[in-house]
Every structure is written in C-alpha cells, then in structure tokens.
C-alpha cells in the first residue's frame, strides 16, 4: 500500500475523538495554534505515514524535517512487515502451539498441548512441574497468561477451567539468571530483540512491575534499550506513562548501565533463530536468559514500532529508520 492509500485507509477508520484529543494534548504541551497542529498532523501522515498516535507518542511536533524522516512510523512499519513476512508462514508465530512445535529446540523447557481427552497427561505433567504457566494460543501482550500452582486436590478443576477459558498451552515455568531476575523476581524479564533481514536492529529489556507475572510494556511494565554493540543498558527505563527510572520503582535495583550477561551469545542465538523460517524476515523475539544461556519465550510476527524510538531513548531526536534501512540494504553475512 502506497502513502496515499495508507492515509486514505487511516482517515476512513480514524477515531476522530482521539484525533482531536491529540490536537488538544499537543496544544497544551507547546501552545501552538490548534489549526497549525491539525495540518501538521495531516502533513506527517502524507510525508511519513504517521498517524496521530505516532505524532503524539514520538513527539513529532518537536522534531524538524530531518529528524522526522528517521522515525519508523506505523505506516512504514506496516510496509516492512508486508515486504518481509510471507502471510503463509505467519501461523508459526501467531499460534503459540505452532511456534513451540517449530522452535522447540530453542525453548529449553517442557510444554504440552491441552486437549479435551488428555487429563492423564496433564496430571503427569503437573506431577513433574507443580507450578505451571498457562497461555491462550493466539493472544498477544500477555493477555490470559497466568502462573498456577497445581496439587492433587485441584488438578481436575484446573484442567477443566483451562479448557473452558481456552488456554491450551501449558509450559514449565521459565527460569532466569540472577542478574535479570533480581530486577523484578515475580516476572520473567525478557529481552525483545528485533531482527530484520537476519540482522538485529533493536533490543530492549522488558521488566515487570507491581509484582505482575508478565513484563509487557502495556501491562505496567518497564522498557529499557540495550545497546546492540555492547549489551549495556545506556538509557533510562520508561513505562507507558512516560515515567523514567534509573532504578526499578519496586525493587530499587539498578537498571541504568546494567550489562546484560552473555550478550554476544544471545545475539548469535537470535540471529540463528531468525534463519529458521527465511520467509519471515521481520520478527520480534522474546528471549529469556537462564543460567545456562538464552532461550525463546515466544516471537511476534508483527513487531510493534512503539517502544523502539521513544523520546527519552533517542539521540538528537533520531529514530530507528536509518538502522532499519541499513539492514534492509545489507546482504546476509555468511
């Protein structure tokens, strides 16, 4: 879809209340005329395929033309997905059961599929793993994920409840290394590492908050960029309310300047995983670091463009598009 086609689609499906709320928000921030802001948002849509959400989230109202050109907007992100990801192979990422089957050697933990006739298998699994992680097979952003303690007394009740709630993926609880776990012990704090054309273009540490089980940014979690070259967190962590943190707000553990252990090994691991399905060239990988090394939690066939280039994480207002373009223009290294 071209720029004009994308803009027309966005206009016809737009939430106009949120659009004008965005205009008022920006007006309160920089006191510019609302009519000017209106046309500036439209201009960003035409030139950069940016919606009003991009305009607000990435503070494009404070960026000049050169800086705006570097932002991976929603429209640009959609175009990259369309170019690099073959729809026939999306099932291996959208469906968590299909993902676990295809990437089993990268999981390093036990798992099973729940069906209406495998209660005995479920009992055997929970004898070995009395605490389990349960997931819907096709939900995103941590929805429906729960950690459950199973006993002989409640095993059948839990089995029936999981069938009723359509949470068919049962996994051994993932474990993580001490350096990452101590940041927020009740959640598995994963690294979201994005590959494009078999190269790493973005890396973030996602950290749980408020004793939640999941670390997702949209579930009150924190996100902190990892320097791809060094493996060091060299910017403050941020939450979805734009609060920034040098230390974790609950555990008081230091986040800024944390060195991710085994970083070079993690990068090799992710690049190798990115080669498993060549037809899917743009993927967001959720990676956990255990004591013995990295392993996959899951992966996303439609990486969001939201946390890569937030204002507190940009240098001189420059977004991620130059790095993405470099990866797209570069032939795979042997």
Regions found by a protein language model. Give the residues of each.
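Conserved N-proximal alpha/beta basic substrate-recognition cap immediately N-terminal to
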Residues: 6, 10-124, 140
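C-terminal active-site "lid" helix and adjoining low-complexity regulatory extension at the edge
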Residues: 17, 247-268, 275-282, 289-334
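Domain-scale recognition of functional cores that engage charged ligands
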Residues: 97, 116-122, 142-146, 175-188, ...
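Glycine-rich phosphate-binding loop of ATP-grasp-fold ATP-dependent ligases
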Residues: 110, 132-158
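Acidic/histidine-enriched active-site and ligand-binding environments that engage anionic O-linkages
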Residues: 123-133
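Protein kinase-like catalytic core scaffold
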Residues: 132, 199-201, 295-297
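Phosphate-binding site of ATP-dependent enzymes
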Residues: 150-239
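A short, polar/proline- and glycine-enriched secondary-structure boundary/capping micro-motif
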Residues: 210-219, 245-246, 306-311
């Amino acid at each position: 879809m071209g720029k004009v086609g994308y803009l027309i689609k966005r206009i016809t499906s737009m939430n106009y209340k949120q659009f004008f709320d965005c205009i008022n928000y920006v007006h309160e921030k920089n006191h510019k005329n609302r009519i000017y802001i209106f046309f500036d948002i439209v201009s960003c849509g035409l030139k950069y395929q940016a919606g009003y959400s991009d305009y607000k989230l990435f503070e494009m109202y404070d960026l000049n033309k050169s800086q705006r050109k570097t932002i991976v907007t929603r429209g640009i992100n959609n175009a990259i997905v369309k170019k690099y990801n073959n729809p026939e192979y999306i099932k291996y990422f959208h469906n968590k059961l299909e993902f676990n089957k295809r990437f089993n050697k990268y999981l390093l933990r036990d798992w099973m599929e729940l069906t209406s006739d495998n209660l005995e298998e479920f009992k055997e699994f929970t004898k070995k793993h009395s605490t389990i992680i349960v997931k819907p097979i096709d939900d995103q952003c941590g929805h429906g994920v729960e950690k459950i303690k199973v006993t002989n007394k409640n095993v059948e009740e839990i089995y029936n409840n999981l069938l009723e709630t359509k949470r068919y993926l049962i996994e051994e609880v993932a474990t993580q290394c001490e350096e990452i776990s101590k940041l927020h012990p009740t959640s598995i704090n994963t690294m979201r590492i994005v590959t494009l054309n078999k190269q790493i273009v973005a890396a973030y540490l996602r950290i749980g908050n408020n004793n939640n089980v999941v670390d997702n940014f949209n579930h009150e979690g924190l996100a902190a960029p990892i320097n791809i070259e060094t493996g060091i967190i060299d910017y403050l962590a941020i939450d979805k309310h734009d609060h920034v943190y040098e230390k974790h707000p609950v555990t008081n553990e230091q986040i800024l300047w944390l060195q991710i252990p085994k970083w070079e090994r993690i990068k090799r691991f992710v690049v190798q995983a990115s080669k498993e399905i060549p037809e899917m060239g743009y993927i967001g990988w959720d990676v956990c670091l255990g004591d013995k090394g990295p392993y996959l939690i899951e992966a996303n066939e439609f990486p969001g463009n939201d946390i890569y280039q937030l204002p507190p994480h940009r240098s001189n207002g420059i977004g991620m598009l130059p790095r993405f373009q470099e990866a797209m223009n570069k032939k795979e290294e042997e």
